[in-house]
Amino acid sequence: MSKTIASVKVIGQRVLNSTTKLINVYAPEIAAEAVPGQFVNVKVCKNTAPLLRRPFGVAGVNKAEGSITMIYRIIGEATHILADVCSGDELSIVGPLGHGFDMSAKKPLLVGGGLGLAPLLFLAEGFGEGNTDILMGGRSAEELFWTKLYESLSKNIYLTTDDGSVGTKGTVMALLPQLLKEGGYDCVYVCGPVPMMRAVANACLEAGVKCQVSLEKYMACGLGACLSCACEGIGKRIKVCKDGPVFWAEEVGEW
């Protein structure tokens, strides 16, 4: 799959919650190639600070309009700069990068938390309206603004929060074992905090259900050259940016 280095124009941004924004950019070559699970590397300004590009999972694509969507949390210098860009501003983007999800599941369950719900949104879109169920967890109701983004895509939405402010109190593991037992799912797709992914992968192993994980690592180059994202796989070192970011759970040796 080809990779494009493109100067793209910002279509617009919108606020999702106090620390999270959604941005749409006009990137027709990337939109034509991207598949669920891939990411792009973004340089947010023309000068040298911040020097390195930042990886963002593709959260959606509109091939007809030639646009891609990214969702990000405002937590560092690069994302603070990104939060201030306006319609018509330009960004430098490399992508699409990495390998995407296996799309052969007949009854998929998506499990996510935090920004891990961004690439899963594109996956739900890829399976088509009403063909996925989603289990999402957060610390509080404020973090689960994602329900509005998924409600037109997923058939069933299951919620958990640490404080019990919405859905079931606890983590996604409060609901997952029962869903695996009764839901008839043939594959689980998970992205989010490492402890959550590890717990989900182990639960799927015990239940005999296939599981794919989308790993989140710092990626300086996004091409497998710098090794900043390398980690232990089963029997070999894996480069998250090049070999992944999506892996079958049994391929991951280091969580």
Segments from the language model and where they lie:
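Ferredoxin-reductase
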Residues: 2-87
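Structural signal for conserved beta-strand scaffold positions within catalytic alpha/beta enzyme cores
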Residues: 12, 60, 159-161, 213, ...
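Short, surface-exposed secondary-structure boundary micro-motifs
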Residues: 45-47, 96, 234
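Short, Lys/Arg- and Gly-enriched loop/turn segments at beta-strand edges
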Residues: 47-57, 98-106, 241
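FNR/FR-type flavoprotein reductase catalytic core
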Residues: 77-215
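Local cysteine-cluster metal-coordination motifs and their immediate loop/turn environment
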Residues: 194, 216-245
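Short microdomains enriched in Cys/His and/or Lys/Arg
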Residues: 245-255
